[in-house]
Swiss-Prot record:
UniProt-recorded Gene Ontology molecular function terms: rRNA binding; structural constituent of ribosome
Protein role: This protein binds to the 23S rRNA, and is important in its secondary structure. It is located near the subunit interface in the base of the L7/L12 stalk, and near the tRNA binding site of the peptidyltransferase center.
GO cellular-component term (any): cytosolic large ribosomal subunit
Subunit structure: Part of the 50S ribosomal subunit.
Protein name: Large ribosomal subunit protein uL6
Record-stated family: Belongs to the universal ribosomal protein uL6 family.
Gene3D superfamilies xref list: Ribosomal protein L6, alpha-beta domain (3.90.930.12)
Record keywords: Ribonucleoprotein, Ribosomal protein, RNA-binding, rRNA-binding
Matches recorded under InterPro entries: Ribosomal_uL6-like (IPR000702), Ribosomal_uL6-like_a/b-dom_sf (IPR036789), Ribosomal_uL6_a/b-dom (IPR020040), Ribosomal_uL6_bac-type (IPR019906), Ribosomal_uL6_CS (IPR002358)
Taxonomic lineage from the root: Bacteria, Bacillati, Actinomycetota, Actinomycetes, Micrococcales
Listed GO biological process terms: cytoplasmic translation
Organism: Renibacterium salmoninarum (strain ATCC 33209 / DSM 20767 / JCM 11484 / NBRC 15589 / NCIMB 2235)
Length: 178
């Protein structure tokens, strides 16, 4: 039995969960999310607890057991608390400006880089070099933050670029001068 998959998921007050065959719908104060459960995995709702089970010990169902449980737990956390990733911009002249719900970055290129906020994601500028990506879908928040970071990855020599707020950049030693 999977160590993670066998743990029951408690459904907090104010969250409504519906299990309809392979479709799990979670509705909470911040919004609604759905997940399609893969074939061998079964989800059961008893009062205010969800249990994820697998019919056999085949490799495919073992690997999906813990994953499915974690994905459902992430849905519940998303609709109650939400997810947020903070990013920092380091470098001379590097900055971010809010243009409505979109962002405009100055990252040392010959042109400003515009980023549109996808549906369900909130982009907030907290200063000229700080921004946050927030939403209820953990995967989407992480993907948008990674795409913003990819615009100018942190340089290993000078440390310039866009990084996560808690990220530590491993610096390389430059060539030795004479």
């Amino acid at each position: 039995m999977s160590r993670i998959g066998r743990l029951p998921i408690s459904v907090p007050a104010g969250v409504e969960v519906k299990v309809d065959g392979a479709l799990v719908s979670v509705k909470g104060p911040k919004g609604q999310l759905t997940l399609t459960v893969s074939n061998p995995i079964e989800v059961a709702l008893e009062e205010s607890t969800l249990t994820v089970s697998r019919p056999n010990d085949e490799r495919a169902s073992r690997s999906l057991h813990g994953l499915t449980r974690t994905l459902i737990a992430n849905l519940i956390t998303g609709v109650t608390e939400g997810y947020e990733k903070k990013l920092e911009i380091v470098g001379t002249g590097y900055r971010v400006l809010a243009k409505g719900s979109d962002l405009e970055f100055a990252l040392g290129y010959s042109h400003p880089v515009a980023v549109k906020a996808p549906e369900g994601i909130t982009l907030t500028v907290e200063g000229p070099t700080k921004l946050s990506v927030a939403g209820i879908d953990k995967q989407q928040v992480g993907e948008v933050a990674a795409n913003i970071r990819k615009l100018r990855k942190p340089d290993p020599y000078k440390g310039k670029g866009i990084r996560y707020a808690d990220e530590v950049i491993r610096r390389k030693v430059g060539k030795a001068g004479k």
